[in-house]
Amino acid sequence: MNVEHEVKLLVEELKRLGQPNSDDKIVVKFGVLFNDDRCANIFEALVGTLKAAKRKKIVHYDSELLLQGVHDHVDIVLLKDE
C-alpha cells in the first residue's frame, strides 16, 4: 500500500470510530484507534500513517510521538475530510 492510500483509509476509519467535538470536527482517542481490530488489520504502521496525515494537515494531535498505553488518551482530530 502507498501512503496516499493509507491516509485515505485512515480518514475512513476516523469517521467510523470518531465523534464530533464542539467544533464539529471528528475526534478519536489514539487508544481507540490503536486497539480497533479493523485498524490493526488495515495498517501495518498506524503511527507512520498518522504522522504522514499530520504532515499533510489532514489530522492534528498534540504529541510528537504516539505510543500505545502512554498516549491512549491523546485526541486525533480530523481536519480535512479527504
Curated annotation (Swiss-Prot):
Q: Which domain of life is it from?
A: Eukaryota
Its BP terms in the Gene Ontology are: regulation of actin filament-based process
Q: Which InterPro entries match?
A: Costars (IPR044302), Costars_dom (IPR027817), Costars_sf (IPR038095)
**Which family does the record claim for this protein?**
Belongs to the costars family.
| Name of the protein | Costars family protein v1g158749
Lineage at the top is: Eukaryota, Metazoa, Cnidaria, Anthozoa, Hexacorallia
